[in-house]
């Protein structure tokens, strides 16, 4: 009886541990608003290649002379590599246009859709708002 109880407890613990990563990961609709598309033009401050999502930080100048610092969620490093990105694709100071969906809480955070470069080139940043997974 004692060993049977231990097996049940151990099995339950393993199932709970396996479910933790799934529960910790958010969905697009939980955090971002598909009706709040934003177009941001600014300069790259930093690109973080981290899991489960990369983060692009940009400074966006406003008409009143102030600057907003936005944090843009992108795909994981492996997704970025598949889409043609590398760690040198967005050096600090690069001028870009970002099409993204803003956070539901109104924070200066968004899930990326596309990045447009001054030469007109567009690339998908692989954010959770992307469903096609294709290069743009």
Question: What are these regions, as identified by a protein language model?
Answer:
Residues 74-82:
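Short, structured beta-strand/loop micro-motifs enriched in basic residues and often containing a Trp
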Residues 103-127:
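OB-fold/S1-family single-stranded nucleic acid-binding modules
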Residues 42-44:
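Conserved hydrophobic positions within beta-strands
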Residues 1-12:
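Bacterial N-terminal signal peptides that target proteins for export
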Residues 23-38:
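Short boundary/loop segments of OB/S1/cold-shock single-stranded nucleic-acid-binding domains
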Residues 82-98:
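Short nucleic-acid-contacting surface segments enriched for D/E, G, S/T with interspersed K/R
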Residues 50-61:
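Short aromatic-glycine-enriched beta-strand elements
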């Amino acid at each position: 009886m004692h060993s049977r109880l231990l097996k049940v407890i151990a099995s339950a613990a393993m199932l709970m541990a396996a479910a933790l990563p799934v529960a910790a990961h958010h969905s697009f609709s939980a955090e971002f608003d598909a009706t709040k598309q934003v177009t941001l033009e600014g300069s790259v401050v930093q690109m973080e290649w981290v899991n489960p999502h990369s983060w692009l930080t940009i400074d966006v100048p406003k008409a009143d002379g102030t600057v907003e610092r936005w944090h843009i969620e992108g795909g994981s490093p492996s997704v970025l590599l598949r889409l043609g990105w590398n760690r040198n694709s967005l050096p600090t100071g690069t001028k870009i246009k970002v099409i993204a969906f803003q956070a539901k809480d109104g924070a200066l955070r968004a899930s990326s859709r596309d990045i447009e470069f001054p030469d007109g080139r567009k690339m998908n940043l692989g954010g959770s708002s992307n469903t096609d997974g294709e290069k743009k």
